[in-house]
């Protein structure tokens, strides 16, 4: 491929990806509509009733019923469309350090002093005093060293409402929650998905993040501050393409 064509394709791809952002210059970032999400779908679409469910028998002389609306009923989320609170309290720290060093050297020599008189004949043909007695001499040496360190300290405390989007056959609940907050020209987005057991939900209808299986927690944003922290398209392309 011609180098000019390659450079033109790179600039064309960068220009196309930037067109969408140019349309929002001078405007505050829009919030996404929850109408198309799985949470609203789970709240509005009635699930197919399970044939194994047996309606509870109401005692005629009893003052209390066993339903969720009763005074002593279990109001924890358990059905599709129910809402529960996810408590996220992350306080992690990690520190790793490692170093490595490698060194290697080698030397090879080879010469032909006598071989049926052939070396003497060849020496007469070589220029600048060359001789087969010192025909080959190789020296090699290599050395590499590396050192790395990782230090992380992360703290995140959030609470978000999530919706049960699916009840699996083994009783495990699939939850999904999202939250968007716009402050000036910056939108903060929080997404939570995962699987929980009904017995892990507290009496306050809340569950901690470390009890969510296959948890996917995303906390980010979009807006002017996020754009300022992100490298330019040209820099990202150069970091990906350039081998040095």
Swiss-Prot record:
Signal sequence region: 1-18
Keywords noted in UniProt: Bacterial flagellum, Cell outer membrane, Lipoprotein, Membrane, Palmitate, Signal
S-diacylglycerol cysteine: lipidated positions: 19
Compartment list: Cell outer membrane; Bacterial flagellum basal body
Lipidation (N-palmitoyl cysteine): 19
Principal place of residence: membrane
Molecular-function GO terms, alphabetical: cytoskeletal motor activity
Keyword Ligase: no
Family annotation (PANTHER family): FLAGELLAR L-RING PROTEIN (PTHR34933:SF1)
Family of this protein: Belongs to the FlgH family.
Subunit comment: The basal body constitutes a major portion of the flagellar organelle and consists of four rings (L,P,S, and M) mounted on a central rod.
Biological function: Assembles around the rod to form the L-ring and probably protects the motor/basal body from shearing forces during rotation.
Name listed for the protein in its UniProt record: Flagellar L-ring protein
Organism: Jannaschia sp. (strain CCS1)
